[in-house]
């Protein structure tokens, strides 16, 4: 097995409820190393750029507004099978259908306020990591 990296966003609903530590703890309890992490406040340009693939969809504007509503925590996580394992850990987009014990089942407020974002492929992870982090901000552990 090869060690992979994935990208995570702890979204505004978690930050506003002061649950950042609970989410980061879940990452570590599930074998992920946090090799980069920072809190950022997205500008409209950053939010629209990050979610550009959804431009024109009905949920795009509300999603951008939501992601700008509070600071977020962006992180790079590392472990074997990081992308797949992270997707399993966070659960489905809709918390009502997410499996018991997943982050979204336990923390999400709604399908939009679903607590976390996770890359859906290694290619997406690499692109999303580069969107928020320079190589000098990522640390081997």
UniProtKB/Swiss-Prot annotation:
Chain positions recorded as ATP binding sites: 11, 59, 87, 93, 104, 114
Enzyme Commission numbers on file: 2.7.4.6
Residues of the active site: 117 (pros-phosphohistidine intermediate)
Record-level GO cellular component terms: cytoplasm
GO function term, MF aspect, one: ATP binding
Reactions this protein catalyses: a 2'-deoxyribonucleoside 5'-diphosphate + ATP = a 2'-deoxyribonucleoside 5'-triphosphate + ADP; a ribonucleoside 5'-diphosphate + ATP = a ribonucleoside 5'-triphosphate + ADP
Alphabetical list of Gene3D superfamilies matching this protein: Nucleoside diphosphate kinase-like domain
Alphabetic keyword roster: ATP-binding, Cytoplasm, Kinase, Magnesium, Metal-binding, Nucleotide metabolism, Nucleotide-binding, Phosphoprotein, Transferase
Entry's localization field: Cytoplasm
Cofactor dependence: Mg(2+)
Keyword Electron transport in annotation: no
GO biological process: CTP biosynthetic process; GTP biosynthetic process; purine nucleotide metabolic process; pyrimidine nucleotide metabolic process; UTP biosynthetic process
Subunit structure: Homotetramer.
Described purpose of this protein according to its UniProt entry: Major role in the synthesis of nucleoside triphosphates other than ATP. The ATP gamma phosphate is transferred to the NDP beta phosphate via a ping-pong mechanism, using a phosphorylated active-site intermediate.
Entry similarity comment: Belongs to the NDK family.
Name this protein carries in UniProt: Nucleoside diphosphate kinase
Species, as recorded: Haemophilus influenzae (strain ATCC 51907 / DSM 11121 / KW20 / Rd)
